[in-house]
Amino acid sequence: MIKHVLLFFVFISFSVSANDFFRADSRTPDEIRRAGGLLPRGQQEAYERGTPININLYEHARGTVTGNTRYNDGYVSTTVTLRQAHLIGQNILGSYNEYYIYVVAPAPNLFDVNGVLGRYSPYPSENEFAALGGIPLSQIIGWYRVSFGAIEGGMQRNRDYRGDLFRGLTVAPNEDGYQLAGFPSNFPAWREMPWSTFAPEQCVPNNKEFKGGVCISATNVLSKYDLMNFKKLLKRRLALTFFMSEDDFIGVHGERDEL
């Protein structure tokens, strides 16, 4: 939960869209670039220790008892404004002399935590949008540097951002997220609208084979399927961009040579 802190917030001009998202993070842009993006903690644990990634929105939103990210978390948190990301950064990363606020383009890998979890969202004031499977480097528009609690200068553009891939995309509709909510076994939400309509079969309370572990496993399978579809979408857009660029080249330089 966010603690209220008193901040001296300086108004600065920045070229971001009202639809963009923001994440405070201790990792530097070079670290993010080497990693290929803002990856979830669970992915690193899976690589280093073979720990299965838990792609469960409800458990992600709850975090651990201490308020930290779960070791096997399959989501990356963002919020809706630069100011809110700054507040979260000061609360979580205030002990750092320096951290960064990354600006993220909207896309269907982002889920509205409050919209999907409704009244069961544990920290609604955070206005979180969670990125399923993390945020690829090509989705990061740029970043702000925060030094000793103050945002310094304007946004630095990410040279690896692919506006052609993300232009016109929007976040996932809540209807796509209800089945990924990941509520625990016998949780009342599974008997309520809208979740009861979208509940995976293994999560329906009146199912004779209903078990918490089976429900969680089903949620992970569905989440991975959604992530796979998002990656396919980017690949299709990348291919379309390539062919459009090739057509432009042919239009200027004449017909393409046949091999």
Swiss-Prot record:
<dbReference type="GO" id="GO:0090729">
    <property type="term" value="F:toxin activity"/>
</dbReference>
<keyword id="KW-0260">Enterotoxin</keyword>
<feature type="active site">
    <location>
        <position position="128"/>
    </location>
</feature>
<keyword id="KW-0732">Signal</keyword>
<dbReference type="InterPro" id="IPR001144">
    <property type="entry name" value="Enterotoxin_A"/>
</dbReference>
<keyword id="KW-0843">Virulence</keyword>
<dbReference type="GO" id="GO:0005615">
    <property type="term" value="C:extracellular space"/>
</dbReference>
<keyword id="KW-0800">Toxin</keyword>
<comment type="subunit">
    <text>Heterohexamer of one A chain and of five B chains.</text>
</comment>
<comment type="function">
    <text>The biological activity of the toxin is produced by the A chain, which activates intracellular adenyl cyclase.</text>
</comment>
<protein>
    <recommendedName>
        <fullName>Heat-labile enterotoxin IIA, A chain</fullName>
    </recommendedName>
</protein>
<comment type="similarity">
    <text>Belongs to the enterotoxin A family.</text>
</comment>
<dbReference type="Pfam" id="PF01375">
    <property type="entry name" value="Enterotoxin_a"/>
</dbReference>
<feature type="signal peptide">
    <location>
        <begin position="1"/>
        <end position="18"/>
    </location>
</feature>
<feature type="disulfide bond">
    <location>
        <begin position="203"/>
        <end position="215"/>
    </location>
</feature>
<feature type="binding site">
    <location>
        <begin position="23"/>
        <end position="37"/>
    </location>
    <ligand>
        <name>NAD(+)</name>
    </ligand>
</feature>
<keyword id="KW-1015">Disulfide bond</keyword>
